[in-house]
C-alpha cells in the first residue's frame, strides 16, 4: 500500500471530541458492498462491478451487488458536511457480510475510488487503520456488533422507505434527542435491511434518491434543526 493511499487525520476539525450536551446524528451505511477478492496471482482487490464482471458471473452473483463506490460516495458526502466538522456526526458501516466498521470523524477518505479501494482492502485485512501522526488514533476499525451498543440509550432509530410518510428530515429531528439513520448503501433492494434496529420509517422525498443524496439531505436537516451553519 503506497503511503498516499492511507487515511490521514484531519486538521483543526479533529473530531474525536464528543459534545455530550448536544444531540448527535449517527449514520449507519447498511448492506455495504466491501468484499475482497484474491486473484490467481495472489493480488487482492476490492470486488466491484467495473473490474470483476467475469468473476462475478462465474460466482453466480448479480453484478449490481458489487458497488463499493456507493459507500465511497456516501463517506465523502458525510465527512465533508458541516455537521461532521462541528463534531456532531458519527458514521458506521455495516457490510453485507455483517462486518461493522467505525469511522473516525477526522478521517480523510481518499477522493479517488482506486485509492479508496486500496484503503478498504488494507482495512479488511488488518481490521484497523491508524493515523500516520498518532498510532493511538484509529481512523477506521472493525468493531463488534451490534451497532446499537454504540448508540445513546435514548437515541431514535430510523430508516428511509419510499413507501412511508414523506417529511422533511428537520421535522423528524428534535432539538434535544440524538438520531440514528440507517441508509442502504446498495444500488437496489428492499427497505427491510434495518428492521431489527429501527423504531420508525420515513420518506424524505417524493422521488427515489441515491444513498449519497439521502445522506446529504439528512445532514442538512440536522444542521437546520440544530442551528449548525
Swiss-Prot record:
Site entry (Interaction with substrate rRNA), positions: 67, 108, 111, 115
UniProt binding sites for S-adenosyl-L-methionine: 160, 184, 189-191, 204-209
Substrates-to-products reaction catalysed: a pseudouridine in rRNA + S-adenosyl-L-methionine = an N(1)-methylpseudouridine in rRNA + S-adenosyl-L-homocysteine + H(+)
UniProt keyword annotation of DNA-binding present: no
Localization per Swiss-Prot or TrEMBL: Nucleus, Nucleolus
Enzyme superclass (EC): transferase
Family matches, as Gene3D superfamilies: 3.40.1280.10
Entry annotated with the keyword Metal-binding: no
GO biological process: rRNA base methylation
Subunit structure: Homodimer.
Function: S-adenosyl-L-methionine-dependent pseudouridine N(1)-methyltransferase that methylates the pseudouridine corresponding to position 1189 (Psi1189) in S.cerevisiae 18S rRNA. Involved the biosynthesis of the hypermodified N1-methyl-N3-(3-amino-3-carboxypropyl) pseudouridine (m1acp3-Psi) conserved in eukaryotic 18S rRNA. Also has an essential role in 40S ribosomal subunit biogenesis independent on its methyltransferase activity, facilitating the incorporation of ribosomal protein S19 during the formation of pre-ribosomes.
Name by which UniProt lists this protein: Ribosomal RNA small subunit methyltransferase NEP1
Originating species: Candida glabrata (strain ATCC 2001 / BCRC 20586 / JCM 3761 / NBRC 0622 / NRRL Y-65 / CBS 138)
